[in-house]
């Protein structure tokens, strides 16, 4: 819910290191805000999306590329692709709409990246090292604490190792942004049923029942 972007829709792929923000390629989509980390993206209510993070392929990754098991096929390079500095790895974020939702054709124009089921590269983020550890998911909702409630469900979290082994995540530990850091006290994380199985549900403008540090399992 980013007011600087068309329809308040945006996707952010950025990160931090010890000395500040991580660098990366330019976004593969326009950015009305001019923020290198955030590009315009017309999310549609009720449409499931797959977020994939994997090494960029070929000469755009400093380390050996992981096997492409389960990774969307996208162009190796795009209009803004660039190789990372020595010692860094290019981590590519890709979003793929999985099905049509109840408002398909209303919130997105024909030909826009969220109207088709084609994978859409967001950008490459450059980080030191060549492994991903301690993954997390979160919902960055740029809305007032008393705004209309928003719900985001994260389901089917899966990691694929370099040998193609599939590891399905079953549990996560809850955390919230503190009020002192700009967060709200009325956000909540719970477990709900989604179309493809149990999911972690992130809710805003609601009563908080799950305390920080609580482990939430998707299946017992």
Question: What is each stretch, according to the model?
Answer:
Residues 10-14, 36, 50-52, 90-94, ...:
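Ordered hydrophobic segments in well-structured contexts
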Residues 14-16, 44, 96, 192-194, ...:
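A structural detector for beta-sheet-dominated domains
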């Amino acid at each position: 819910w980013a007011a600087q972007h068309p329809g308040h829709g945006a996707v952010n792929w950025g990160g931090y290191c010890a000395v500040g923000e991580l660098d990366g390629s330019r976004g593969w989509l326009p950015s009305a805000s001019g923020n290198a980390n955030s590009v315009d993206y017309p999310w549609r209510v009720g449409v499931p999306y797959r977020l994939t993070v994997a090494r960029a392929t070929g000469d755009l990754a400093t380390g050996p590329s992981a096997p492409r098991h389960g990774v969307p096929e996208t162009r190796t390079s795009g209009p803004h692709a660039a190789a990372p500095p020595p010692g860094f790895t290019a981590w590519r974020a890709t979003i793929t709409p999985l099905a049509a939702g109840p408002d398909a054709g209303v919130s997105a124009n024909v030909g826009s990246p969220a109207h088709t089921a084609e994978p859409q590269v967001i950008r490459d983020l450059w980080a030191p090292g060549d492994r991903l550890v301690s993954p997390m998911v979160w919902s960055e909702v740029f809305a007032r604490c008393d705004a209309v409630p928003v719900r985001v469900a994260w389901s089917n979290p899966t990691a694929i190792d370099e040998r193609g082994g599939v590891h399905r995540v079953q549990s996560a530990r809850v955390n919230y942004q503190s009020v002192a850091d700009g967060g709200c006290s009325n956000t909540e994380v719970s477990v709900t049923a989604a179309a493809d199985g149990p999911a972690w549900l992130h809710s805003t403008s609601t009563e908080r029942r799950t305390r920080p540090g609580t482990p939430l399992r998707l299946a017992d």
